[in-house]
Every structure is written in structure tokens, then in C-alpha cells.
Amino acid sequence: MTDKLSKYIITVFGASGDLSKKKTFPAIFGLFKQGEISKDECKIVGYARSKMNDEELRDRLKPFLLKQVSKESNGEKIVDEFLSNVTYVQGPYDTDEGYQKLGEAYKEIEKSLNKGSPVNKLHYLALPPSVFGSVCEKIKNNIYVNEDDAKTKIIVEKPFGHDLESSRQLQKELAPLFTEDELYRIDHYLGKEMVKNLLILRFGNILFNSAWNKENIQNIQITFKEPFGTEGRGGYFNDIGIIRDVMQNHLLQVLTLLTMERPVTFDSEAVRDEKVKVLKAIAPIDHDDIIIGQYGKSXDGSKPSYLDDETVPEGSKCITFAAMNFQIRNERWDGVPIVMKAGKALDVGKVEIRIQFKPVASGMFSQIPNNELVIRIQPDEAVYLKCNMKTPGLSTTTKITDLNLTYADRYEDFWIPQAYEALIRDALIGDHSNFVRDDELDVSWALFTPLLDYLEGENAPEPTIYAYGSRGPVELNXYMHXHNYKYMHGDIYQWPVTRPDSE
């Protein structure tokens, strides 16, 4: 069940931090700009230890908000109107004093917002996980509300732990304080337009729904590529690595939506029940069936290696690229390789899904490419299906082409919300579908922790060095071939703009 969008105070904890300035406040502003929240029904409060007043916070936020309205003639006016709705409370995170001050600020806001009666509170914790427990305890003891028309909701940011043990410890701290209905664990990939579209694409189209199984699908790829390295943040990244950064969370969420069974309804609990079921069906990750890499200098020497980053410990084995195969032991997917790949400092920046179907029966055609469904999550959302067609003319030769749905070409003047915009709105209306449940989190860490222990142990394998700006480790193509992926056009898909002289 979801709530109607009612009166709220949204408090951003960590208001002076980078995440708040670059993501959280811009997302709330995006909802304001689109009319999803209004000054009459929603007030915004920033909370942090930094000593500043309302105007100083507004001045810090303004440049980031102006970027969103740079093409609008009245953009600055919209930004100023939003910022007039933002106030600031300064205080510590670990003592009651600041929260009591926050409570007094709430009372003043509620006088104008709801004639003095309590309103809903959404607390967005843009903070390190190490302080989640203590901050939540202070919220519960000082500013918690749970009435018919006034509820408390908490959004917490990833990472939700460093491994299975730390994740369970974090949950142990939060569980006595707030119910699952009050907690929203945010994984921003679940707010991306194409990720939210996966269930509609699968279950709303009979041609895909009926072919979505081991009888028809030969291979699935989930790919994350960044064209840049750690750029001076290697010291931070060194403690995380690419697997914790995007694979255990973002890409695993994509995998569950791709492979889960049809839920009974679109109710958030029904969707998350099916995600947990498919997670439990995944076999342990085979430590001998992975590729790990670390980027070196670019082939021309112009781009630095990971170890050239001054913040990186000497001789670090940190993994900046990984590819691994998932096997789902159930009736639908048993035997289908599902390869997850992610890396930094690669040739392009993109996130996409490739579902390659099995070849048609031999006999009529001597050789014909496999059909392939490609779902591009970013940049430039798109879905296209690679199909075989007759080449125009007298011959009966075939050519691969595509049925193409590129969002920018098909949907004009539509607002496609950014991930954080979509998820904050979901939290405001009480929709948990695109947030991570406690048991889901536990199963995902149970799947990845043995692999991480192996890769970070005393006998950890050496990552393969690959060139900055390349496609990744040289053994990647052979790895994909071994997992049933059939490349076309010299291993790189060519967009099908075909002319007679190119035959």
C-alpha cells in the first residue's frame, strides 16, 4: 500500500556534505520544479555540524541547483523560490542537544504548515554508515513521531555494511529502533528509468515473457563501464573495490529484476518476495570462474595507472575490473550463464544488459546471427532488439538490423526523473518496491562475502593489468566465448546503417 502525498518535513542529515549538495538537494529540487512537492505542503531542513545559517546553506546549494535549470529563462527564479523553503539547523550527531533544537525547529515549521499539528517526517541520512545507528537512536529518542496523520520515515544510503557480518551488525542496531515500513535502504540504481522499466518490459509483453527462460536464452550480460579511473580518490576506493562499489548492490539488483518470477501483484512486498527467492536460488560464486583486473597506464602513456594515484597504498591489489558468472539453480534458468562485468578506466561509459537468444535451427540458413535484446540503462535510455532481415535487392542474403526504442527519439517533452528524484518521491508516498529489504540485503552479502574473503585474503590472486582506455583484461573475449556469448562483426556490434557499397 502507498500513501497519498501529504504534508512533510524533509530533513537532510549531512547537509554540508558532497552527497547532499550533488544528489540529495538537487533531487528534492527536481521534485519541486516538476510540481511533485510544494511550498505549502513540504518544508526542507538541512542538518549538519558545520556552523552556518540558512543563507549560507542556500548559497552553497545554489550553484548545484542552477545546473538543472541552465536552459530555462526563469531558472534562477525557480531556484530562489525553492531555496526560500530551505532552512538550516546546526548541531552534533552524537548528543541529544542538536536533535532537541531540530525538534523546536519542527514545531515552528508546523505552525505554518499544519496549524501546529505534527506532520510526516522524512529523514534522509546522507552520512557514513558508521553513524547510522547512533543518529537513528537520537532521532527515535528526540524527534520520532508515529500518529495517524504523522509518520517517521528514514532513508539510509549504501553501503549497507562492508560484508555479511558488518551488514548484520548494522541491521541489529537499526531493527529495535524502526520497523521495515519506516526504513528505506536506498540503492539509486533501482530509481533509474530503465531499471524501473524491466518488470513492465518482461511481464507486460507476451513475446518477451514467453521466451524468458533457458529454452530460448543462451547468455545474459550485465555490464557497467566507466571511462575514468579513481581520479585522486583511490585511497577511498582501495577499501571498497569494484565488487562492493557496484556489483554486490547495483548490478545484483538488476540481475534480480531480470530473473525473478512474476509477482502476484505490483505490491512492494510481492515484488521483493520474488527478488529474495531468486537470490536464494543463485549458486555460490565459483572462485575459479572469474576475471579480476586493475588498470595500468594507457597505451600512449597519457593516462595514469591505478597505482600512480598518490592516495593508493604501494603495491595495492585493489580490483578495478571484475567479471563473474552467476548460475541460478531453478527451473527457469538452470544452465544459463549470467555474466556480470564492471570496471573503471575502460573504453566507454555505459551500463547495459544484453540478452542473447539461442540460434535458430540449422538447415534453412547456413549461418545467421543470434537475436539479441539490448537494454541500455545509461547514457541515453534505449531498448533495441537485433533481428535478422533480408538484404534489400534480388538476393536472399540476410543482414542484422534492429527494432529500436531510443527514449529521446520516441518520447518528446517527457520528464524522465533522475534516480534520486524517483526514489525520494517513492519514499514520500510509502512505496517500498524500489528499496532494499533486510532479508534481501542479507542474502546478497551471503552470496558475495566468501568471494571477497578469497580475493582479499593472504593468498589473494594478482589482478590482471589492463590498459587505461581499453575494453578490460585481454582474456575477457575468451571468457565470454566460454560462457556462450557469440560475438558479431569482429566482436563489436555495429549499428546497422547499411549501404549497398558496404556489402
Curated annotation (Swiss-Prot):
Pfam families on file: G6PD_C, G6PD_N
Repeat listed as a keyword: no
Gene name of the record: ZWF1
Domain of life: Eukaryota
Organism encoding this protein: Hanseniaspora uvarum (Yeast)
Example of a GO MF term: glucose-6-phosphate dehydrogenase activity
Source lineage: Eukaryota, Fungi, Dikarya, Ascomycota, Saccharomycotina
Free-text function comment from the UniProt entry: Catalyzes the rate-limiting step of the oxidative pentose-phosphate pathway, which represents a route for the dissimilation of carbohydrates besides glycolysis. The main function of this enzyme is to provide reducing power (NADPH) and pentose phosphates for fatty acid and nucleic acid synthesis. The G6PDH activity is required to cope with hydrogen peroxide and potassium bisulfite stresses and plays a role in adaptation to conditions used in wine fermentations.
Chain residues that bind NADP(+) 2: K341, K350, R354, R376, Y384, L385, K386, R471, Y487
Pathway: Carbohydrate degradation; pentose phosphate pathway; D-ribulose 5-phosphate from D-glucose 6-phosphate (oxidative stage): step 1/3
Protein name: Glucose-6-phosphate 1-dehydrogenase
Gene disruption: observed consequences: Leads to slow growth on glucose. Confers methionine auxotrophy and hypersensitivity towards hydrogen peroxide and sulfite.
Active site: H250
GO CC annotation: cytosol
Enzyme Commission number(s): 1.1.1.49
Positions contributing to D-glucose 6-phosphate binding: K158, H188, Y189, L190, G191, K192, E226, D245, K344, Q378
UniProt entry keywords in alphabetical sequence: Carbohydrate metabolism, Glucose metabolism, NADP, Oxidoreductase
Any single biological process term in GO: pentose-phosphate shunt, oxidative branch
Residues annotated for NADP(+) binding in this entry: G14, A15, S16, G17, D18, L19, S20, K21, R49, K158
Binding site for NADP(+) 1: G14, A15, S16, G17, D18, L19, S20, K21, R49, K158
InterPro entries: G6P_DH, G6P_DH_AS, G6P_DH_C, G6P_DH_NAD-bd, NAD(P)-bd_dom_sf
